[in-house]
Amino acid sequence: MQIASSPFTHNQRSTRRIMLLVILACIPGIIAQTYFFGYGSLIQVMLAMITALLAEGAVLQLRKQPVMARLQDNSALLTALLLGISLPPLAPWWMIVLGTLFAIVIAKQLYGGLGQNPFNPAMVGYVVLLISFPVQMTSWLPPLPLQGTSVGFYDSLLTIFTGYTHSGENIHQLQVGYDGISQATPLDTFKTSLRSQPADQILQQPIFGGVLAGLGWQWVNLGFLVGGLLLLWRKAIHWHIPVSFLLALGGCAAVSWMIAPQSFASPMLHLFSGATMLGAFFIATDPVSASTTPRGRLIFGALIGILVWLIRVYGGYPDGVAFAVLLANITVPLIDHYTQPRVYGHKSGHK
């Protein structure tokens, strides 16, 4: 008899179908990200998926596992997708290959494959790249309305593989907006500018021209929010983690903002910038590395939300979703141990 590994679900849908549903739910966010930041994200995702399938197939072959059966569970594709859309669109090709190899081979297969990994593989790959190559990992283009140079599919492909567009511009030149000023993400801009300006002056910059948050980034987050609500509606994920994540992050941001509005970002900026919605619905809800009890999921999600706020405000990185998820993964055994539902009729006794 062969027993399948986790993740297990309460319904009869296979792991393959659930993974595919999560991939499809990412589409609204990917469309928004492609519109505002170019085709580079699609190229990164394709490179990551090819690398993930080849790497997982090779490791499964070495482990004498059924290659095609394991590859068809779509878990490698989902890991690749999450990593691909997390990287700057025009990051060098070798970075996505390296990050994907680390995610699949080290963070997933080294622990025994799907259902055995204690950490989210995509976030392990992301953090390895962020620590090793911080400059490349923060080289985001300005959103479409602020771009000084339009970057099409061909130029995106050339920049990823050669470092230059067909006209000879590199990534640093492409980062310069229409106003001649090098652009950064809203969270990065806010955090850096706070050293010399009050918040109300910072928010006058064009990058903060969105209704909810940063220009472009608010639509990316809304896209992933739509996909996340689809997953909740289809019962592919539990509500506990994303709700507690967003409430904790929004609560911390609201309290600090009300106390010192000139020193802290507003709750809306935190909720609709960076990887907030992607993290809440697609990353933190990983059924393998997240808590498995109802109360545990609430604690797990809230812990991630608090850690994201702490890292964004006091840490060395503008966005803290990846670090927060991995730190929370460490606490899962402890959380699950103390939040196990009590068996009906069970009474604690003494020897």
From Swiss-Prot:
GO CC terms, sorted: plasma membrane
Keyword annotations: Cell inner membrane, Cell membrane, Electron transport, Flavoprotein, FMN, Membrane, Phosphoprotein, Translocase, Transmembrane, Transmembrane helix, Transport
FMN phosphoryl threonine found at: T185
Enzyme kind, highest EC tier: translocase
Compartments in which it is found: Cell inner membrane
Pfam family, one: NQR2_RnfD_RnfE
Entry's EC annotation: 7.-.-.-
Topology in the lipid bilayer: Multi-pass membrane protein
Cofactor(s) it depends on: FMN
Domain of life the protein comes from: Bacteria
TM stretches of this protein: 18-38, 40-60, 87-107, 121-141, 211-231, 241-261, 264-284, 298-318, 320-340
GO biological process, one term: electron transport chain
InterPro entries registered for this protein in UniProt: NqrB/RnfD, RnfD_bac
Family under the similarity heading: Belongs to the NqrB/RnfD family.
Binding partners and assembly: The complex is composed of six subunits: RnfA, RnfB, RnfC, RnfD, RnfE and RnfG.
Function noted in UniProt: Part of a membrane-bound complex that couples electron transfer with translocation of ions across the membrane.
Protein's name in the database: Ion-translocating oxidoreductase complex subunit D
Originating organism: Yersinia pseudotuberculosis serotype O:1b (strain IP 31758)
